[in-house]
Swiss-Prot record:
Encoding gene, per UniProt annotation: purD
Assigned protein family: Belongs to the GARS family.
Alphabetical list of Gene3D superfamilies matching this protein: 3.40.50.20, ATP-grasp fold, A domain, ATP-grasp fold, B domain, Phosphoribosylglycinamide synthetase, C-terminal domain
Complexes and interactors: Monomer.
Cofactor info, note text: Binds 1 Mg(2+) or Mn(2+) ion per subunit.
Record flagged with keyword Ligase: yes
Protein name: Phosphoribosylamine--glycine ligase
Pathway participation: Purine metabolism; IMP biosynthesis via de novo pathway; N(1)-(5-phospho-D-ribosyl)glycinamide from 5-phospho-alpha-D-ribose 1-diphosphate: step 2/2
PROSITE patterns per UniProt: ATP_GRASP, GARS
Family annotation (InterPro entries): ATP-grasp, ATP_grasp_subdomain_1, PreATP-grasp_dom_sf, PRibGlycinamid_synth_ATP-grasp, PRibGlycinamide_synth, PRibGlycinamide_synth_C-dom, PRibGlycinamide_synth_C_sf, PRibGlycinamide_synth_CS
Domain ATP-grasp per the UniProt entry, residue ranges: 109-316
Length: 429
């Protein structure tokens, strides 16, 4: 069968790499893909942008694609799934209506409130004065979020009132996040430890994926501004069996049932970003309507199940007949980014020292890369690569991941040197 993966990031390289391992699959196309997918013998890039739905659809029809897997959020919120389904094509992802769970933070917070799903206390604002009054009433620390899609960067955790007021002005008057900031959500600052809880949903049944923990801040020790994610590991020890059960009962099931009841039946990957308090109670920080990036990379390295088989079952509403199998070992991925990220950075720099052959139990996934005409690999984004490895402990996986990237460099490249620190601290105690 033929599979199409939509996207060009590290997540899509990992999903396509995993899909190509399925015995059901003959060819995997990636639209538009990156240098990493271009260099994989089993994958084929197609030069179509992720939001060019007519071109994606006509390619899928022309090539008789049997299954499409959507990586990023942008095509989901503009209805790629609706278009493919209307044409009778199998596609794994939520409809435009269901993708509002990620596309609008205000929609999500109101949905959570309607269904009594645990989350931070909040209010939505479109005007500066009431927003500032609310800030002064609540005090800092406090969280300000742009309503729409801002590539994971539209969230300001303000530790002082001045910082909070500046963020409100910036988002509502200064238009720091384009259309995404015309409405903001202000919510209470939650204390605890974060985890990424990702499941597959077929509208009615749910199949949990491996848990993971992302590192959002750009700097070591979780300092500096938020990014799309600087590294991740799986499983996340903070998600104990008890926390897992609470998350399914209090968050995942009520969300799936609530969406169906409101006429937005949810199919696709559903990613709950959780904050887990000292008592092991999870609250929703955010929902994403797709697999996380960089969480996908370590999770796919651990996945023993056939990803394509699971996606097909989900498209047919038969996820209850499937289980997922995972490597017992831990997996850890470190993002190598371009100097200046998450601010402005240069592109087109040549990347040196990429591993020339496959490594056992490790893989360097490509994100912001492109292949030059002379086959040199160049940078094309802020997050460029993700060096990922398995290990019997998180500490061992960390050591192996960093070893994979020893020789990789380009002008200004950088990474955090402490990915996995929370889990390693637990292992040592």
């Amino acid at each position: 069968m033929k599979v199409l993966v939509i996207g060009n990031g590290g997540r899509e390289h990992a999903l396509a790499w995993k899909a190509a391992q399925s015995p059901l699959v003959d060819t995997v196309f990636v639209a538009p893909g990156n240098a990493g997918t271009a260099l994989e013998p089993a994958l084929q890039n197609v030069a179509i942008g992720v939001t060019d739905i007519p071109a994606l659809l006509s390619f899928a029809q022309h090539e008789k694609i049997d299954l499409t897997i959507v990586g990023p959020e942008a095509p989901l919120v503009i209805g790629v799934v609706d278009a493919f389904r209307a044409a009778g094509l199998k596609i794994f992802g939520p409809t435009e209506g269901a993708a509002q769970l990620e596309g609008s933070k205000a929609f999500t917070k109101d949905f959570l409130a309607r269904h009594q799903i645990p989350t931070a206390e909040y209010q939505n604002f479109t005007e500066i004065e009431p927003a500032l009054a609310y800030l002064r009433e609540k005090g800092a620390p406090i969280v300000i979020k742009a309503d729409g899609l801002a590539a994971g960067k539209g969230v300001i955790v303000a530790m002082t009132l001045e910082e909070a007021e500046a963020a409100v002005h910036d988002m509502l008057a200064g238009n720091a996040f384009g259309d995404a900031g015309h409405r903001i959500v202000i919510e209470e600052f939650l204390d605890g430890e974060e985890a990424s809880f990702i499941v597959m949903v077929d509208g009615e049944h749910v199949l949990p994926m491996a848990t993971s923990q992302d590192h959002k801040r750009v700097g070591n020790g979780d300092t500096g501004p938020n990014t799309g994610g600087m590294g991740a590991y799986s499983p996340a020890p903070v998600v104990t069996d008890e926390v897992h059960q609470r998350t399914m009962e209090r968050i995942i099931w009520p969300t799936v049932k609530g969406m169906a009841a409101e006429g937005n039946t949810y199919t696709g990957f559903l990613y709950a970003g959780l904050m887990i308090d000292k008592q092991g109670n999870p609250k929703v920080i955010e929902f994403n309507c797709r697999f996380g990036d960089p969480e996908t990379q370590p999770i796919m390295l651990r996945m023993k199940s056939d990803l394509v088989d699971l996606c097909l079952a989900a498209c047919d509403g038969k996820l209850d007949e499937k289980t997922s199998e995972w490597d017992e070992r831990a997996s850890l991925g470190v993002v190598i980014a371009a100097g200046g990220y998450p601010g402005s950075y240069s592109t087109g720099d040549e990347i040196h020292g990429l591993p020339l052959e496959e490594v056992a139990d490790g893989k360097v996934f490509h994100a912001g890369t492109k292949l030059a005409d002379d086959d040199r690999v160049l940078t094309s984004g802020g997050r460029v690569l993700c060096a990922t490895a398995l290990g019997h402990t998180v500490a061992e996986a960390q050591k192996r991941a960093y070893a994979l990237m020893t020789d990789i460099r380009w002008d200004g490249s950088f990474s955090r040197n402490d990915i996995g620190w929370r889990a390693i601290e637990r292992e040592q105690n």
